[in-house]
Amino acid sequence: IIVYLISYFISAVGPGAISAQAIMIIFSVSLSVQLGIKPYMMSSMAILGTVGGTVSPVALTGVIVHDLTAKMTPPLNANTPLLISITIMNAICALVIYVIFKGYKLKMPEYKAGDNPSDFKAVSFNRDQIFSLIGMAILIVVVLAFQMNVGLVAFVIAVVLSLCNAVNEKMAFKLIPWGVLILVGGMSILMDVTYQVGGIQLLTDILKRIMNKTTAAFIMTLISGITGWFSSGNGVVIPTFVPTVPDLANALGGVSPIELIISIVAGAAIGGLSP
């Protein structure tokens, strides 16, 4: 449970699921070996936690969805219902895994003298880590309270940390997920072109033929999930299907656009766990 909560928090404060998973999966597996817990249960908790937190307004998926909904006519603000819904969904999945693998029956292993983790002294945060935590707190407050662009604020904070010699710039550049950035940027350009040539309208017309107001949310979740098995949720699935929501909601009648957006993101989030 603690691994899930830590993973959720790390993902929600900005890095998103991909970056947070790179940290938390390694940490959770190492911790599971020390505690005698099944590694796949701990790693699953870490993954679900990061996926739940990535839809926060300052994290990767949340930012992508916000940008897409802001372009709609009229603009939609799905941040809060999206965060609540995806958080509940992933918490339920984590609870199911916890019960299936009998996490409630786990007992602390017996340690030899000097090997018990509880005997180790706590390590204090150093100067650079404290500065980084302060920067993350400022990012959250500025973005949520003053509605400023999360990317711009993040860059400014990164520059300030660099000027304070609180970061290793070379290491920071190496840790940037360039592949993800290029994928998301490239797909954004592609989707703009697709929209201009009528591709989104064509996709919307196809979807309208196979669903009604009762089945719309289920079908969108299913299609997004299956598509997410073979492609990136953030780079492909969400930018492709979210723009179809306004026309679908108008055509079907009685369907909430926010409900459809949540369905798309939920399907993409779970489908994105595919190898």
List each model region and its residues:
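Hydrophobic alpha-helical transmembrane segments of multi-pass integral membrane proteins
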Residues: 2-30, 35, 40-43, 210-273
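Alpha-helical transmembrane segments of multipass membrane proteins
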Residues: 5-9, 31, 51, 95, ...
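Transmembrane alpha-helical segments of multi-pass membrane transport proteins and ion-pumping complexes
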Residues: 8, 12, 58-59, 86-102, ...
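Hydrophobic alpha-helical transmembrane segments in multi-pass integral membrane proteins
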Residues: 59-60, 67, 187-205, 255-258
